[in-house]
């Protein structure tokens, strides 16, 4: 994910290492791999665990990688799907308000949007029904089955638009190229709302990525829309050497 997001923002390398290298970005994001995975394929240190609940990538780790790789020029703004008590924060009205705030910046190229979500809330991007003809139908979101991948995932948004019916859709850039159309994955935004709220006992949310100097203003606009800005946890270990704070 970050291997194409960061170079697209003009950050191609750090300390002589290319930011398009998956193993380097995994190191910066403090990813925890499975204990059975061959650590020899990683050129940089990564943690490992035999406990599935302690594997994967945390949202704070992603924010860490963005901040360090950009030399502090980019900042992440975390918006959790649920509030601190565990109730859904991003209900329909707040979700639409958040998209209304983010859309102009995203469409102008001033912001990136990264989702940390439960895949099984989305349309099944490998199902036979997930094809251009069916996706073009007005009832696509009701006739294409939901996914059954059974994982949490990160993916950035690549496009956002409204259909003639007014229904909002987006395109995800999935790092798994066997999904969708070589990783290009149209999805209804309402299903993404459900996906970041999550029903799998894990935390989800949205990371808004902007220039450091633009972060404070965007935080205020998001909060004025009735949406709290707060880092969430998704069960994967957060970095022990870095903590998010506004502007980082």
Which residues does each PLM region occupy?
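Cysteine-nucleophile protease catalytic domains, especially the papain-like/related folds used
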Residues: 1-110, 200-205, 210-248
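Broad hydrophobic/π-residue packing in well-ordered secondary structure
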Residues: 72-74, 154, 160-161, 199
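Active-site-adjacent substructure of cysteine-protease-like catalytic cores
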Residues: 90-172
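Noncatalytic regulatory segments and standalone regulatory/sensor domains
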Residues: 138-149, 160-248
